[in-house]
Amino acid sequence: MPDQNDQVAVEWGPYQIVQSTGARPYAKYMSNGKDKIYFAYTTGHPDNENPNFLYFNYIDIHSLQLKDVKGNTLSTIADGTFKVNKTDDYARQYPSTLIDNPSARDWVWQVASDENDNPVIAMVRISSDKNSHDYYYAKWNGHEWKKTFLANAGGHFHQTPNSEKCYSAGMTIDPANTNHVYCSLPVEGKQGKVYEIVKFILNEVGEVVSTEAVTQDSQQNNVRPYIVPNSKIRLCGSHGCMAIITIGLSVHGIRKAIAQGLPVILKVSRGRRRKRLL
């Protein structure tokens, strides 16, 4: 936009906003639709990072500055990246950038905001051995992150035993009512232990007040719930079993999984010879 003197300044991008010491950080983003872009992100992929911290920042779109949850300026985006890590020194210097600095592995699922523009986070704490996944609801109350344990989600949800052990069955916050959270949990029912969708209702201070079974006694898993914004179809997800196969390692495994009716996630393996499947 031209300034008061009808002059236009052009700045070229894109800019790298944050740089982590970890490998393959994961991030989730959302906008309040007015003046802020919220995002939460990890040190790296939980497979590679133990511990794996979870951070929160927002972009002020008027000043184009990166800020922490209290509004403190961390950097001007055009001037360079803000560097994060998982040391004690970093935690002491930038405490308001941290949602969680656990002793194990965090992963982020969603960023939302309540009616007062306070950020709300869906997150998972994964044990060091990756065999236990705990769902948490984290909400900024103006002073601190209130982290509420929702449920244990077992381990990885898919049917491949020794691959992608940090893949949880999934959770999602309703952006229209951030006190409602939907989680996929292993539940014992008529068909044995199957992943079902459970709704958690929390109060304004982040305490669970009730739960409700959305699916029950299913024959196959219900995983990866997701709220469709601005739609009459509010909640969707995946149904059935799933296998993860690395391309180039097991064409036979792919054919076997397909023959069993399993949806297959094809994971490309770098540096390995790939075989043509069809």
Where are these regions (language model features)?
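Extracellular, repeat-based ectodomains that mediate carbohydrate processing or recognition
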Residues: 1-278
